[in-house]
Amino acid sequence: MTIMRKTHPLMKMVNHAFIDLPTPSNISGWWNFGSLLGLCLIIQIASGLFLAMHYTPDTLTAFSSVTHICRDVNYGWLIRYIHANGASLFFICLYLHIGRGIYYGSYSYVETWNIGIILLLLTMATAFMGYVLPWGQMSFWGATVITNLLSAIPYIGTDLVEWIWGGFSVDKATLNRFFAFHFILPFIIAAMAMVHLLFLHETGSNNPLGIPSDCDKIPFHPYYTTKDFLGIVLLLAFFFTLVLFFPDLLGDPDNYSPANPLNTPPHIKPEWYFLFAYAILRSIPNKLGGVIALLMSILILALLPHIQTAKQRSLMFRPISQFLFWLLVSDVLVLTWIGGQPVEPPFIIIGQIASFLYFAIILILMPIAGIIENKMLKW
């Protein structure tokens, strides 16, 4: 008798993706983040669905409805904090996943990598719109400042901004459409994640050595299901410590004040996971130049497969490139810190140097390091 998981049309798909999938025998814990991102997405969709049952996307009642969720709905405070901190967890896993991809040369799988970049952009858009929904001070002013950046686009900019706002300022129409998009986008992200997996399974997973592993594959289950389960347990332990003991650690106190168009907060800033890009945006005095730099800070990832000069895929045995990689990580952390600081000396010049270094490492120094390493190995 044949096994049902190998013959049933639906179970066969699951079997090929998660059970009998041939997987390299030497992939490390850094490969856990794909499944952890899937878990984060499930947590966000589930908690978001329950929040949407009680939330009202109206400028007069949005803030009150969030207060009502926290005070009157059974475990509403817990659902809200799970959702708010779940976004932070999502981005922590996302950035670690991208970092692993850069370190081990996973960007060589161009289709998978490009779908990943689209997933990153969709997730950033979803998180931004979600931040606007509680209709606190930082929600309102964050929405105003970030959407206003589109006015830098020549000729059509102003019309585009008013079209997105649904009026002449961020108001009820804006909140309504942001809620609609915030609800639908996670399902689009889930569909794109399936496409991401589809392309990945066409080539098979990369491994820390960056060499073909066709001669040494093991089934995904039970080896990597067990390994992923350990990752999930550790992640949830960290997550619920954050949610239950430090729920407001990563939030902004300004968002506990209702939105007031007549009172500008002293320092407008997005959530922590956008601060590095925000710092790059602010470091260029020209508005259009800043918007282009902001976009390029993410889209530069798409260039990685095309500017790789090294003949070794992974950075595991390339000390110069390793140094540059960790310099890049440090630089992104510096940019994150600068993005949260006011626009005044010495933060302005630090931000400009860090922004220049960000692009210089990726576009100039890493390709040069690859050529030097090839020469050192006489390749």
Swiss-Prot record:
<dbReference type="GO" id="GO:0006122">
    <property type="term" value="P:mitochondrial electron transport, ubiquinol to cytochrome c"/>
</dbReference>
<comment type="function">
    <text>Component of the ubiquinol-cytochrome c reductase complex (complex III or cytochrome b-c1 complex) that is part of the mitochondrial respiratory chain. The b-c1 complex mediates electron transfer from ubiquinol to cytochrome c. Contributes to the generation of a proton gradient across the mitochondrial membrane that is then used for ATP synthesis.</text>
</comment>
<keyword id="KW-0812">Transmembrane</keyword>
<dbReference type="Pfam" id="PF00033">
    <property type="entry name" value="Cytochrome_B"/>
</dbReference>
<keyword id="KW-0999">Mitochondrion inner membrane</keyword>
<keyword id="KW-0679">Respiratory chain</keyword>
<feature type="transmembrane region" description="Helical">
    <location>
        <begin position="113"/>
        <end position="133"/>
    </location>
</feature>
<keyword id="KW-0408">Iron</keyword>
<comment type="subunit">
    <text>The cytochrome bc1 complex contains 11 subunits: 3 respiratory subunits (MT-CYB, CYC1 and UQCRFS1), 2 core proteins (UQCRC1 and UQCRC2) and 6 low-molecular weight proteins (UQCRH/QCR6, UQCRB/QCR7, UQCRQ/QCR8, UQCR10/QCR9, UQCR11/QCR10 and a cleavage product of UQCRFS1). This cytochrome bc1 complex then forms a dimer.</text>
</comment>
<comment type="similarity">
    <text>Belongs to the cytochrome b family.</text>
</comment>
<keyword id="KW-0479">Metal-binding</keyword>
<dbReference type="Pfam" id="PF00032">
    <property type="entry name" value="Cytochrom_B_C"/>
</dbReference>
<keyword id="KW-0249">Electron transport</keyword>
<dbReference type="GO" id="GO:0008121">
    <property type="term" value="F:ubiquinol-cytochrome-c reductase activity"/>
</dbReference>
<feature type="binding site" description="axial binding residue">
    <location>
        <position position="196"/>
    </location>
    <ligand>
        <name>heme b b566</name>
    </ligand>
</feature>
<feature type="binding site" description="axial binding residue">
    <location>
        <position position="97"/>
    </location>
    <ligand>
        <name>heme b b566</name>
    </ligand>
</feature>
<keyword id="KW-0830">Ubiquinone</keyword>
<keyword id="KW-0813">Transport</keyword>
<dbReference type="InterPro" id="IPR048259">
    <property type="entry name" value="Cytochrome_b_N_euk/bac"/>
</dbReference>
<feature type="transmembrane region" description="Helical">
    <location>
        <begin position="226"/>
        <end position="246"/>
    </location>
</feature>
<dbReference type="InterPro" id="IPR016174">
    <property type="entry name" value="Di-haem_cyt_TM"/>
</dbReference>
<feature type="transmembrane region" description="Helical">
    <location>
        <begin position="347"/>
        <end position="367"/>
    </location>
</feature>
<dbReference type="InterPro" id="IPR005797">
    <property type="entry name" value="Cyt_b/b6_N"/>
</dbReference>
<feature type="transmembrane region" description="Helical">
    <location>
        <begin position="288"/>
        <end position="308"/>
    </location>
</feature>
<dbReference type="InterPro" id="IPR036150">
    <property type="entry name" value="Cyt_b/b6_C_sf"/>
</dbReference>
<dbReference type="GO" id="GO:0005743">
    <property type="term" value="C:mitochondrial inner membrane"/>
</dbReference>
<dbReference type="GO" id="GO:0046872">
    <property type="term" value="F:metal ion binding"/>
</dbReference>
<dbReference type="InterPro" id="IPR027387">
    <property type="entry name" value="Cytb/b6-like_sf"/>
</dbReference>
<dbReference type="InterPro" id="IPR030689">
    <property type="entry name" value="Cytochrome_b"/>
</dbReference>
<protein>
    <recommendedName>
        <fullName>Cytochrome b</fullName>
    </recommendedName>
</protein>
<dbReference type="InterPro" id="IPR048260">
    <property type="entry name" value="Cytochrome_b_C_euk/bac"/>
</dbReference>
<keyword id="KW-0349">Heme</keyword>
<feature type="transmembrane region" description="Helical">
    <location>
        <begin position="77"/>
        <end position="98"/>
    </location>
</feature>
<feature type="binding site" description="axial binding residue">
    <location>
        <position position="83"/>
    </location>
    <ligand>
        <name>heme b b562</name>
    </ligand>
</feature>
<keyword id="KW-1133">Transmembrane helix</keyword>
<keyword id="KW-0472">Membrane</keyword>
<feature type="binding site" description="axial binding residue">
    <location>
        <position position="182"/>
    </location>
    <ligand>
        <name>heme b b562</name>
    </ligand>
</feature>
<feature type="transmembrane region" description="Helical">
    <location>
        <begin position="320"/>
        <end position="340"/>
    </location>
</feature>
<feature type="transmembrane region" description="Helical">
    <location>
        <begin position="33"/>
        <end position="53"/>
    </location>
</feature>
<feature type="transmembrane region" description="Helical">
    <location>
        <begin position="178"/>
        <end position="198"/>
    </location>
</feature>
<keyword id="KW-0496">Mitochondrion</keyword>
<dbReference type="GO" id="GO:0045275">
    <property type="term" value="C:respiratory chain complex III"/>
</dbReference>
